[in-house]
Amino acid sequence: MLTHLERLEAESIHIMREVVAESENPVMLYSIGKDSSVMLHLAMKAFYPAKPPFPLLHVDTTWKFREMIAFRDETAARLGLDLRVHINPDGVANGIDPFTHGSAVHTDVWKTQGLKQALDHYGFDAAFGGARRDEEKSRAKERIVSLRSEQHRWDPKRQRPELWSLYNARKRKGESLRVFPISNWTELDIWQYIQLHDIPIVPLYFAKERPVVERDGALIMVDDERLPLREGEVPQMRKVRFRTLGCYPLTGAIDSDATSLDDILQEMRETRTSERQGRLIDSDSAGSMEKKKQEGYF
């Protein structure tokens, strides 16, 4: 009899193989976090001994933690994968940043528009993503195989039934799919799977003394000199880690002593808050994640 994690693994591998068989030009969105690391491990397993029959795509906002970028490049080189990095040229030309323009504009330009540009440029018709239903309410109601319009928009009213684990990957010309193989996993499942298979992850997930400032109720790490300090702010060293990773000025750390996977698992069993409480972009407005997804966001 399969264990809980083995059932989740089998489901995810089935989804990947099914979509690859029914699409012409698939891609895996690689955001460098723990979910992407698990999804990549599953992809390596699904198509072994061959490499995954699709490239990795990272939509780079230029504001990721430095350790994330180093981990991205090391992972692609170690596994010999086709990594494609897209940076929105409009964001570069207009100097978009989360401080001057705000998190909503920053996210739209760098992430949403950047992703749509990359998908159009390469002609990808199916994109694997690492979103999970337990993360956030709009992700909870989105299907595993999610249809997107020619403009990459998501319409919740056009979702298809997925009875008996049957996935409809049909689409009209110009439409595309967003596919979420680990949709049914929980944060605890992810960490247990990482420990079971010794999957490499970004060191930022482990507690360490790091320079942070307390801003609007969040602990923001001072990752480089671009972070403007407000009046009275002085970076202080605190033992923190991150439950979720994104652009460093928009990602809050948590106080933690978890320096190992065992420590993190124990912390997960005791926590009563969502991992996305540290993502400042989720607080832009009521229902902001669903609005972003309707506009083409991950």
From Swiss-Prot:
This is Sulfate adenylyltransferase subunit 2. One of its GO terms (biological process) is sulfate assimilation. It comes from the Bacteria. It holds the Pfam family PAPS_reduct. Pathway: Sulfur metabolism; hydrogen sulfide biosynthesis; sulfite from sulfate: step 1/3. It is an enzyme of class 2 (transferase). InterPro entries: PAPS_reduct_dom, Rossmann-like_a/b/a_fold, SO4_adenylTrfase_ssu, Sulfate_adenylyltrnsfr_sub2. Its EC number is 2.7.7.4. The keyword Nucleotide-binding applies. Belongs to the PAPS reductase family. CysD subfamily. Gene3D superfamilies: HUPs (3.40.50.620). GO terms for molecular function: ATP binding; sulfate adenylyltransferase (ATP) activity. It catalyses: sulfate + ATP + H(+) = adenosine 5'-phosphosulfate + diphosphate. Residues 272-298 are annotated as: Disordered. Residues 272-282, 289-298 have a biased composition (Basic and acidic residues). With CysN forms the ATP sulfurylase (ATPS) that catalyzes the adenylation of sulfate producing adenosine 5'-phosphosulfate (APS) and diphosphate, the first enzymatic step in sulfur assimilation pathway. APS synthesis involves the formation of a high-energy phosphoric-sulfuric acid anhydride bond driven by GTP hydrolysis by CysN coupled to ATP hydrolysis by CysD. Keywords: ATP-binding, Nucleotide-binding, Nucleotidyltransferase, Transferase. NCBIfam families: CysD, PRK05253.1, PRK12563.1. The lineage of its organism: Bacteria, Pseudomonadati, Pseudomonadota, Betaproteobacteria, Burkholderiales. Heterodimer composed of CysD, the smaller subunit, and CysN.
